[in-house]
Every structure is written in C-alpha cells, then in structure tokens.
C-alpha cells in the first residue's frame, strides 16, 4: 500500500535523518538538512522515501549558481532526495521523471526533466523573453546553442548540482536538483506533482509502485 506523508499538512511533523552517500550526494550542514526537510513534500513506500522541495526563492540559485541562474531563464530547480531504507539497491530511471502540471480541470501537461546539457541550452538561448505572453502549452525541450567555454562552465555547474547517481545503495541516500523549464510560470508549481514512475529493486528485479508527490504541499522556498 502506498503511503503519502506531507510534513506541513494535518499538523504532522516528520523528522527524517538524511544519510548522504560519499561523493555522489550534496553535503549540506545539519541545520540546512533540517530546514530542507521541514519544507519538503514526501512520499514513502516499499523501502524508498522521496522528498522534494521546489526552489522558488531566487536567493537559493544565487548561492548555488555563480555563472547563470536557471531561475532567471524561466526554469525551476526541484531539490530531490532519494532515501533507500531497504536491504536492496534501488535504481531510479531519472530520464522518466516528469512534472505533471494541472492547468485547468480539463487540461494537464507533463513536463520532462532537463539534463544539464539541455538546461544549459535553455539558459544561454538568444533573444529576449516576453514574460507577459501566455505560454500554454509549455514547449518540450529547448533550442540548440553554440557550446563554447561559457556553455561548458554553465553546464558544469548544473551537472554538479544535479542528481549525480541513479543507483541508491542499501540504507543510503542520493540528493540533487532536477530542472524543469516552466517558462517563468512558477505559480504552476502549486498545482504540480513530481511523477517518478520507474524505480527497480535490483537484486529482486522488482519494480516499485510509482511515486507522485504534490509540490503544492511543500513549503515555499
């Protein structure tokens, strides 16, 4: 049975220790970890817990990205932590993760997560944006741009901050950022869910039930 926990809803407070694994995980201090978890939406079942926190505060991007901010380019970074409490290694198919956005009662859209290369292309694309213009539906993918030294520096920052491993060892966790191009429509996040459809317990060769985590339940950050 799937269990969904939101640590800011129904007066329920969850305190989850974060065990970061080696050089594949981000290493925030204990106070930052606790603040992050308090602002996260979580879902847990079958030994896997996924916590997510959308970054909607531009200051967070300034601390992490010194070259170019994904936020300024209309993207949202979603901090995600995969915690494996089982005795089996878990493999997450990062390429299949989506941001499911509810535009209206009758209209929904799935937005692909971007690789660091795709995100760098979006950040460095030429031309001014017309933020006031309606952007429905949100296009899939981004333009190809020249990949010079500047592009390489931007891509490296995005890659270093991203989720850098898809296999989570038993009783460990992996944390990083996922990137979604919402074309500066950050208000959509209150009606969005992070959809993680493909996680496999490797030794048992058993697929887990999908995760669908409501970003509207995460605290504003």
Task: Pin down the residues of each PLM region.
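Conserved functional micro-motifs across diverse proteins
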Residues: 29-221
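N-terminal secretory signal peptides that target proteins for export/translocation
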Residues: 1-7
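Bacterial N-terminal signal peptides
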Residues: 9-23
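Intrinsic disorder/low-structure terminal segments
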Residues: 3, 14-18, 210
